[in-house]
Amino acid sequence: MRGNYLSLLVVLIVLASNDVLANNNSSTPKLRRSDFPEDFIFGSATSAYQVEGGAHEDGRGPSIWDTFSEKYPEKIKDGSNGSVADNSYHLYKEDVALLHQIGFNAYRFSISWSRILPRGNLKGGINQAGIDYYNNLINELLSKGIKPFATMFHWDTPQALEDAYGGFRGAEIVNDFRDYADICFKNFGDRVKHWMTLNEPLTVVQQGYVAGVMAPGRCSKFTNPNCTDGNGATEPYIVGHNLILSHGAAVQVYREKYKASQQGQVGIALNAGWNLPYTESPKDRLAAARAMAFTFDYFMEPLVTGKYPVDMVNNVKGRLPIFTAQQSKMLKGSYDFIGINYYSSTYAKDVPCSTKDVTMFSDPCASVTGERDGVPIGPKAASDWLLIYPKGIRDLVLYAKYKFKDPVMYITENGRDEFSTNKIFLKDGDRIDYYARHLEMVQDAISVGANVKGFFAWSLLDNFEWAMGYTVRFGLVYVDFKDGCKRYPKKSAEWFRKLLNEKKND
């Protein structure tokens, strides 16, 4: 255990030695496209449930998010759902035109599992209308010179599998996900060359099974009495285990059946903030290391070594599932690239380990907070959790480089939100500042050796923002949900257009 801590401290020291200041009070950085490698990819991202709509059309089966938001509207801040969302199911050509107009050369989207397999598995049949929709989207992208980056799971587990065996609580889901991935590779892999198996498995685990504020809304009663059921000390680890194995199974089927002919790459999109020690004390430094172990390392370590982080093994003990030797072999090296979703950072402070009301949140024995001595780590966006700390994206990327064998990386999500208003709001200077500062930090990480190949802005469109509904907006493009989902590019879209056309930003 001591060796593990020492190796992490070496990483932290290296990051500190390469430190650059990110002064939130300075003027917005001026960037050029030529500041980045010639083959660097610039794109934007969305997810199926957040933008598609058409939730009950053309044979699509329900997902757990349909059930969660439609059956329990009180769990969504404005009582809304994604049944229509941005109506991208019908307006996808407009979305592709916007991407082309801005100058992006890649688009990260997710495939709705239940649009392909309405009941989640092969026994329930394949929905050809779903296959046709994604073929049309992919072909439209390619016709405009835009590379498709496809995510196979962005939180929308088919409700039929949740009903059958508890969704990702059941080991059966690994085979069902493998079969679903096989269908995706078979039908789209001749044109899609960049795949992500899962998006933010950490969010699925934490918000769906510990906090209970996202689908399927499970948690311990002492955490949230409104949860329908659950156990925040055990279920998150079971779900995380099956998510990791599902990833491994999908990569395995690609490499065995499709890699030779399709020559694509398969990765995963992981989210994490950077965790700074609350003080410079050794205890708080170790607390920050544990916080990383239970977030980013939780899903990265098994893909590199076939094992869980030592801190998780030591703290969770018998509640943490074990990989068999065969599973470890399957997982080790099961990625061609790593996607990193970064928004914010926090401080971590050492606290005694809990013996009462234990959950995954208490297991790291670290208190995670966005402020120190009453001072926030950075300015707050609309969402309470989104405190702006640009340097964190650099530190996280370099952490991944130094600790996990210098992987190929893409920034697969990065962005900030503003509150929704009754007026069309296009002058999003704060978003421009956010992107400029974070891209500056990404460029700095590249300059010291980080193997970052691309950047995807979250999000192309204002959309259904999960438990927040439509109360906040992350889009480069304003969507008028009251007027047929009309799209209006914001100033940030124009900023990207100028950047990608090699003009100096004012």
Curated annotation (Swiss-Prot):
Pfam family, one: Glyco_hydro_1
Compartment(s) where it occurs, according to its Swiss-Prot or TrEMBL record: Secreted, Extracellular space, Apoplast
EC number(s) given by UniProt: 3.2.1.21
Keyword vocabulary terms for this entry: Apoplast, Disulfide bond, Glycoprotein, Glycosidase, Hydrolase, Secreted, Signal
Residues at the active site: E200, E413
Gene3D superfamilies, per database record: Glycosidases (3.20.20.80)
Glycosylation (residues): N24, N25, N81, N226
Any GO CC annotation of this UniProt entry: plasmodesma
pH-dependence of activity, as noted: Optimum pH is 5.0.
Membrane-spanning parts: none
Disulfide bonds: C219-C227
GO biological process, one term: quercetin O-glucoside metabolic process
GO molecular function, one term: beta-glucosidase activity
UniProt-annotated binding residues for a beta-D-glucoside: Q50, H154, N199, E200, Y343, E413, W458, E465, W466, F474
Domain of life assignment: Eukaryota
Catalytic activity, as annotated: Hydrolysis of terminal, non-reducing beta-D-glucosyl residues with release of beta-D-glucose
Principal subcellular localization: secreted
Induction: Up-regulated during abiotic stress recovery.
Signal sequence bounds: 1-22
Entry similarity comment: Belongs to the glycosyl hydrolase 1 family.
Function (record text): Beta-glucosidase involved in the rapid degradation of flavonol 3-O-beta-glucoside-7-O-alpha-rhamnosides during abiotic stress recovery. No activity with quercetin 3-O-alpha-rhamnoside, quercetin 3-O-beta-galactoside and rutin.
Official protein name in the record: Beta-glucosidase 15
